[in-house]
Design a protein with these regions (language model features):
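Pre-Walker A (pre-P-loop) alpha-helix and adjacent loop at the N terminus of AAA/AAA+ ATPase modules
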Residues: 9-56, 235, 239
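Conserved beta-strand position immediately N-terminal to the Walker
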Residues: 48, 112, 150
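C-terminal engagement/docking regions of AAA+ P-loop ATPases
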Residues: 2-7, 11, 241-325
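Walker A/P-loop
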Residues: 42-79
Length: 325
């Protein structure tokens, strides 16, 4: 049974996330589903990977979300000569004090926009690993905590694009979700010409929240109830990827945690204090697909991981309420 305070928290979450989505959609035309997923990842304490060809608005979406929530934001342009210390920071000698002091890197921000992350070397890409999972950075044996909220929104071009490096499996697994922007519909593209021709909409975008508000929203989403049968459903879906003959690498235990958190966030955004199977099903592909590697036979048959997941959704039994539950 939902208490009055829980109901009020959910109501406030619906109101604020609606305002955030409206603010971002005032800049990003014709992509409401992508914007909704980005906000879901934010509430689920995850990180978002935006993958698509250049020029479809990946970086613009990341900047718009950061500005709409009124949090500190740093942008990292990933290039082949970018160093790990540029991301994490490092010790710099202070001549006045005659001692080394820590200079924070670009990762010390609420929102980190990693632009074209797969253009940097794997060594530099891996500099994000600790910060993404543990919300901390260790430099020269000293650990520095990152202040919440903390979200990495990384963009990458398809791997067949020139000058790109594939993201390691360990790093892909740390992104809660991946989404492709796609080209906008004709009407949205015309609206973009009108809107961006007159002024830069990002420059006039006003924040509709702040860091403290986002922290409260995250806590509200985390408290959403998930019944045991829902948790078992999530585990069944994840384990099904590991036994599928179409996949040579299935989903990790971390992916089950990400799927559960994202489902709770989606439920809260729909005004509910409990998770439904629909919440899980809606997020299976964006949360799991980028972690999976197809088998050789699946590649020959052109069966992408997203297609395999769609098939698993049709075969894994839906959860049923237990007698007396």
């Amino acid at each position: 049974m939902t208490t009055t305070s829980e109901a009020q928290g959910i109501e406030a979450l619906v109101h604020v996330t609606g305002a955030i989505r409206s603010a971002v959609e005032s800049v990003i035309d014709g992509k409401p589903d992508v914007v909704r997923l980005a906000v879901t990842v934010l509430l689920g304490e995850g990180h978002l990977l935006l993958e698509d060809v250049p020029g479809v608005g990946k970086t613009m979406l990341a900047k718009a979300l950061a500005r709409s929530i009124g949090c500190s934001v740093r942008r990292i342009q990933f290039t082949p000569d970018l160093l790990p210390s540029d991301i994490t920071g490092g010790s710099v000698f202070n001549q006045e004090r005659a001692e080394f002091e820590f200079k924070p890197g670009a990762v010390f921000s609420n929102v980190v926009v990693g632009d074209e992350i797969n253009r940097a070397s794997p060594k530099t890409q891996s500099a994000l690993l600790e910060s993404m999972e543990e919300r901390q950075v260790t430099v020269d044996g000293t650990t520095y905590r990152l202040q919440p909220p903390f979200i990495v929104i990384a963009t990458q071009n398809p791997i067949e694009m020139e000058g790109t490096y594939p993201l390691p499996e360990a790093q892909r697994d740390r992104f809660m979700a991946r989404v492709s922007m796609g080209y906008p519909p004709p009407a949205a593209e015309l609206e973009m010409l009108e809107r961006h021709g007159a002024h830069d909409p990002l420059a006039t975008l006003e924040p509709v929240a702040d860091a403290e508000t986002v922290r409260r929203l995250v806590a509200t989403a985390r408290a959403v109830y998930a019944a045991d049968v829902i948790k078992e459903y999530v585990v069944s879906l994840v384990r099904a990827t590991r036994s599928s003959p179409d996949l040579r690498l299935g989903a990790s235990p971390r992916s089950a945690l990400h799927l559960m958190r994202a489902a709770k966030a989606r439920a809260a955004m729909h005004g509910r204090a409990h998770v439904l199977p629909d919440d899980v099903q809606e997020l299976v592909v964006p949360v799991l697909a980028h972690r999976l590697l197809p088998s050789a036979d699946a590649q020959l048959a052109r069966r992408a991981p997203a297609d395999v997941l769609t098939g698993l959704l049709a075969t894994v039994p839906l959860p049923r309420a237990r007698p007396g539950a």
